[in-house]
Amino acid sequence: MAVPKKKTSKTKRDQRKANWKHQAALEAQKALSLGKSILTGRSTFVYPQDEAEDEDE
């Protein structure tokens, strides 16, 4: 006979949700920082400028 599973407690649910939101906030902060870096032109570590490529054009 089928038996229903135990209900997850509100505390456990809230812990998981808080962890997920924290991780999402960190990723959003990284993305914003990366975007700012690209816009200000300080993004040499992201898109290294190859000197030879610029000369060919």
Curated annotation (Swiss-Prot):
One of its GO terms (cellular component) is large ribosomal subunit. The keyword Ribosomal protein applies. Residues 1-21 are annotated as: Disordered. Residues 1-20 have a biased composition (Basic residues). Keywords: Ribonucleoprotein, Ribosomal protein. Pfam families: Ribosomal_L32p. One of its GO terms (molecular function) is structural constituent of ribosome. GO terms for biological process: translation. SUPFAM superfamilies: Zn-binding ribosomal proteins. Belongs to the bacterial ribosomal protein bL32 family. NCBIfam families: rpmF_bact (TIGR01031). This is Large ribosomal subunit protein bL32. It comes from Rippkaea orientalis (strain PCC 8801 / RF-1) (Cyanothece sp. (strain PCC 8801)). The gene is rpmF.
